[in-house]
Swiss-Prot record:
<dbReference type="InterPro" id="IPR019776">
    <property type="entry name" value="Flagellar_basal_body_rod_CS"/>
</dbReference>
<comment type="similarity">
    <text>Belongs to the flagella basal body rod proteins family.</text>
</comment>
<dbReference type="InterPro" id="IPR001444">
    <property type="entry name" value="Flag_bb_rod_N"/>
</dbReference>
<dbReference type="GO" id="GO:0006935">
    <property type="term" value="P:chemotaxis"/>
</dbReference>
<dbReference type="InterPro" id="IPR010930">
    <property type="entry name" value="Flg_bb/hook_C_dom"/>
</dbReference>
<dbReference type="Pfam" id="PF06429">
    <property type="entry name" value="Flg_bbr_C"/>
</dbReference>
<protein>
    <recommendedName>
        <fullName>Flagellar basal-body rod protein FlgC</fullName>
    </recommendedName>
</protein>
<dbReference type="GO" id="GO:0071973">
    <property type="term" value="P:bacterial-type flagellum-dependent cell motility"/>
</dbReference>
<dbReference type="Pfam" id="PF00460">
    <property type="entry name" value="Flg_bb_rod"/>
</dbReference>
<dbReference type="GO" id="GO:0071978">
    <property type="term" value="P:bacterial-type flagellum-dependent swarming motility"/>
</dbReference>
<keyword id="KW-0975">Bacterial flagellum</keyword>
<dbReference type="GO" id="GO:0009288">
    <property type="term" value="C:bacterial-type flagellum"/>
</dbReference>
<comment type="subunit">
    <text>The basal body constitutes a major portion of the flagellar organelle and consists of four rings (L,P,S, and M) mounted on a central rod. The rod consists of about 26 subunits of FlgG in the distal portion, and FlgB, FlgC and FlgF are thought to build up the proximal portion of the rod with about 6 subunits each.</text>
</comment>
<dbReference type="InterPro" id="IPR006299">
    <property type="entry name" value="FlgC"/>
</dbReference>
<dbReference type="GO" id="GO:0030694">
    <property type="term" value="C:bacterial-type flagellum basal body, rod"/>
</dbReference>
Amino acid sequence: MALLNIFDIAGSALTAQSQRLNVAASNLANADSVTGPDGQPYRAKQVVFQVNAAPGAATGGVKVADVIESQAPDKLVYEPGNPLADAKGYVKMPNVDVVGEMVNTMSASRSYQANVEVLNTVKSMMLKTLTLGQ
């Protein structure tokens, strides 16, 4: 594997993890949004990754294939005084799992940091290679 390929692979991972962090942040920001523009509670989103290898290559980077809505059911919270409550007093809340999103955020952040370290290591190796002939 050429060193320049490592830059492409790690760079694609940085982009993918950045998108994952953005989606998790959006989910956390909307965890208490009872209604959206369509009048329904916010639906949590998830990032779907896909291998991004050149044809015939054994290795490759990663890309975000899609951002999908979570199929988890909405949460029901008993608030009989809320104007959005149904006849039984329950309000439909977003299906965001706050703890799961925090774990997802930490995982994406660690993955991002690991890929930055990969880039720094490869850069250091290339600089040392250039000084071998001196």
